Amino acid sequence: VVGSLKSQGDMPGGIVALSAGGTIKWQYEISESVSSTPVIDKDGHILFGTERGNFYILDANGTDAIAVLDVAGAIANSESAYASEWAATQGKFWSSPVVDADGTIYVAITNTQDESKSLLVALSSKYVKGLPTTGWPMRAKDAQHTATVK
């Protein structure tokens, strides 16, 4: 089981993995809060967004960030029609990412300036190859959010 941590005071945020018995297997700490459920891809990488607009891809052991994408900054500095309404530090991931079969990552990001504008962003990374064919790799089980067990 992999879950998220909110940063509070001196306590860091990040991701924690628990064994079936509830003991901590590992913890990846960052100085940002994580409000969404992480996703696990085909190779076991752990993907999540933060409340500062950064998107992390951790190795399967949860020990190293193999990619950190500044999505809020990329929107603010893009040629997009939305760029003028964003600042590099004004993005927050509240929703859980979804990864499709070809490895495209879909996630909603909210402008924290007034929290009235959100965008659905499609991300790609050479590290993400798709979803596992078994298990429960993301919130509500799959990209369709069926939340069913057969």
Feature map (PLM): residue ranges:
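Extracytoplasmic/lumenal domain signature
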Residues: 1-150
